[in-house]
Amino acid sequence: LDRSSAASDVYKRQLWDKLKCVARRGDYAAPDADLLAQNRMAAGIYLTCQGLPFMQGGEEFARTKHGDHNTYRGPLELNRLDWTRAAQLEELVQYYHGLLEIRKAYPELSGMAGDAEPCILSLPGWLIGFVPERQGESLPGRLAVYYNPECTRQWAALPAGSWRYLCDGTRAAAEPFGPACRNAIELAPVSVTILKVE
């Protein structure tokens, strides 16, 4: 058994703990709406990027080790998965589930479908938007992805077509939902939005 610190990263600080630490909000077990939005955004970013994603067990319910960054020899209370948090943060669990279903249903997000480079959309400020694949020069891809790191709602132009949500920043599903959008879309604060063309 290799007990060196290089053997594994599972004892490092969890995403939730990192968010709490950076925000200097000490009660690691307490839910926090702002940090839950950041947690959803982080998951939305890495699950819409090319390559194979890696997430730590329990991330989908904001697993915490109460700020302890090295629990290698720590007690079971810190190293176990606290399933009561999964019940308390069911909406976050469902969000992760939806993102994973989207990634499974749309292989162009992973880059594993052999698609061309994503088409980056021209957007103002800190907004990022892209179409994961191209279908010729004049046709948009079937998906559009937007990242809004701002703490306020932002407007972004849409590629041509009629678009519906797969992810609106708080809900994610492999089947489109919500009303159709054309020309522009209002992005929720601190969110990832995924749209599918009709």
Task: Go through each PLM region and give its residues.
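Carbohydrate-interacting/catalytic domains
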Residues: 14, 31-198
